[in-house]
């Protein structure tokens, strides 16, 4: 839907009616039709494009227009990774919170500290827990960095040359959007 909407805004022969039809049927997935088609063409993405076209007959000709299946699959993987990193981040924040409470609770409880795997001197359980917490905070910073800088792979057509899009746009200058970050 996003591709069709963008292509419409850029002046390709994509109508609002077609975009509306795609939008209205975005969750209307005929898995049986896609599975049957995949038996014939042995191509997962194009089988789903075909099945989507069955429920969106007015838009069938513009679904996936100029795109390559890797564009769909690879960018989907990036979105899945982003969502997974968000889950990890939420859980990590909870662990840090619990560990900070643990450190505060045991801040006065003495224990033996080690250096080079050898007993060294007294410290507290709370102090040791703050060191563990510090390591997790560095992991959290790394997750934040990765989420803030995660990028989609762009859409440069079948072989990365933009030839399919250049043809659609009649040789008009191609624009690279690979610098755009994925919304978090």
Model-assigned labels for residue ranges:
Residues 178-184:
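Conserved small/polar residues in nucleotide/adenosyl-binding loops
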Residues 1-177:
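A helix-coil-helix interface module used to build multimeric assemblies
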């Amino acid at each position: 839907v996003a591709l069709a909407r963008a292509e419409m805004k850029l002046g390709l022969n994509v109508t609002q009616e077609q975009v509306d039809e795609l939008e209205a049927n975005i969750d209307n997935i005929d898995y049986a039709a896609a599975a049957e088609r995949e038996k014939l063409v042995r191509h997962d993405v194009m089988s789903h494009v075909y099945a989507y076209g069955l429920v969106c007959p007015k838009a069938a000709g513009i679904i996936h227009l100029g795109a390559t299946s890797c564009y769909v699959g690879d960018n989907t993987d990036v979105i899945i990774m982003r969502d997974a990193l968000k889950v990890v981040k939420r859980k990590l924040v909870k662990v840090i919170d619990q560990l900070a409470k643990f450190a505060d609770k045991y801040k006065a409880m003495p224990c033996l500290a080690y250096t080079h795997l050898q007993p060294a001197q007294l410290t507290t359980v709370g102090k040791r827990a703050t060191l563990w917490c510090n390591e997790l905070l560095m992991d959290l910073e790394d997750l934040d960095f990765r989420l803030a800088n995660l990028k989609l792979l762009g859409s440069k057509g079948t072989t990365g040359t933009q030839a399919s899009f250049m043809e659609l746009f009649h040789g008009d200058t191609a624009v690279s959007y690979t610098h755009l970050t994925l919304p978090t």
